[in-house]
Amino acid sequence: MATVIVEGDFEKALKKFKKIIEKEGILTEYKRREFYEKPSVKRKRKERAARKRLIKALKKKGLL
């Protein structure tokens, strides 16, 4: 995890910290692991995400 050192304004430091947290996906990972997810639910979520990526790629190429 990156260390943020900003001298001066607290708001700037907080904004930079939030940006780093969002970029590394720490908050989303925490929310996802907050409760137990059954393997079948996890598999369906991953399949849904893969399908979404495929459709997005096809739309980008103009095939859909």
Curated annotation (Swiss-Prot):
GO molecular function, one term: structural constituent of ribosome
Domain of life: Bacteria
Gene3D superfamilies listed in its UniProt record: Ribosomal protein S8
Keyword check for Ribonucleoprotein: yes
Keyword NADP: no
One GO cellular component term noted in the UniProt record for this chain: ribonucleoprotein complex
Keyword list, A-Z: Ribonucleoprotein, Ribosomal protein
One GO term of the biological process aspect: translation
Pfam families assigned to the protein according to its UniProt record, in alphabetical order: Ribosomal_S21 (PF01165)
Family: Belongs to the bacterial ribosomal protein bS21 family.
HAMAP family: Ribosomal_bS21
The protein's name in its UniProt record: Small ribosomal subunit protein bS21
Organism the protein comes from: Sulfurihydrogenibium sp. (strain YO3AOP1)
Gene, per the UniProt record: rpsU
